[in-house]
Amino acid sequence: MEEVNVHEDLKGVILYAKPEYDDEVKQDWLILVESIKRERHFRSNDLHIYRHASYGLRNGVFYCGEIPGNWGFANGFKFYLPTEKQKIEFIKKIAKEGYKYISVLNKLVKKT
């Protein structure tokens, strides 16, 4: 898969997190959520955090809503473009399992 850098001020990001965590992944996720909550520019409809089983990548899967059709896997905060088949399978999985989301903020905050 092609790897591209993620701009730290991306808006309209949808971030998917695993519903089941080992302690290390859970800690990383809590750090990320707290970092996002501390940001001052709050717009509830800009960043949606989902509890969703990822493809086994540590920090889950995200979709950048500002760039139409720009789907990606997040591992750390590097961005990987999936195949069309992977996108379709992922959409079907979300539709089937019906995960709820929490609206949080307007940008993805890099983990320190």
Predicted region positions:
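Intrinsic-disorder/low-complexity loop/linker signature
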Residues: 9-12, 23-25, 47, 60, ...
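Mixed-charge, Lys/Arg-enriched low-complexity segments
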Residues: 75-112
